[in-house]
Amino acid sequence: MKIIYAFLLIAVVAFMGSGIMAEPLTDKPGQAKKIRIFDRIPELINWMIVNH
């Protein structure tokens, strides 16, 4: 269980970090797709944990 919690913690930190880093880029219209990819990272990690 500790491993799962570690993955979730990393996912949350990565999600928050990518959100902070992506904020200045929202002024450019081409950056929206990259931000959506960052938003999907925690979902992918959770999917990998559930289906492993």
Curated annotation (Swiss-Prot):
Presence of the UniProt keyword Signal in the record: yes
Propeptide, residue positions: 23-24
GO molecular function: toxin activity
Keyword match Secreted: yes
Chief subcellular location: secreted
Superkingdom of source: Eukaryota
Signal peptide start and end residues: 1-22
GO cellular component: extracellular region
Reported tissue expression: Expressed by the venom gland.
Keywords assigned by UniProt, alphabetized: Neurotoxin, Secreted, Signal, Toxin
Localization (cell): Secreted
Protein role: Probable neurotoxin.
Family membership: Belongs to the formicidae venom clade 4 family.
Entry protein name: Myrmicitoxin(1)-Pr6a
Provenance organism: Pogonomyrmex rugosus
